[in-house]
């Protein structure tokens, strides 16, 4: 479960078994976990986050998308 970024209370990561799916990240804070596709950026599941938090998370992803995609490709060898 590689962590690729931490911003404030949020941890951005993917699971080692995720390579069969389209490129995405999971976002965790406390007991909440959301999932966001990266190409294009699109919310898959909100995981209990509020709309305002999802908005913040999506803005973070927009600003770090390239680095997240690079981390995915480096890890999975794409």
Residue ranges and their predicted role:
Residues 1-10:
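Negatively charged, low-complexity tracts enriched in Asp/Glu with abundant Ser/Thr
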């Amino acid at each position: 479960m590689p962590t690729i970024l931490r911003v404030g209370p949020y941890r951005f990561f993917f699971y080692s078994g995720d390579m069969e799916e389209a490129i995405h990240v999971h976002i965790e804070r406390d007991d909440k976990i959301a999932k966001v596709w990266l190409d294009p950026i699109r919310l898959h599941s909100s995981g209990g986050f509020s709309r305002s938090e999802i908005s913040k998370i999506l803005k973070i992803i927009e600003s770090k998308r390239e680095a997240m995609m690079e981390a995915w490709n480096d890890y999975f060898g794409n």
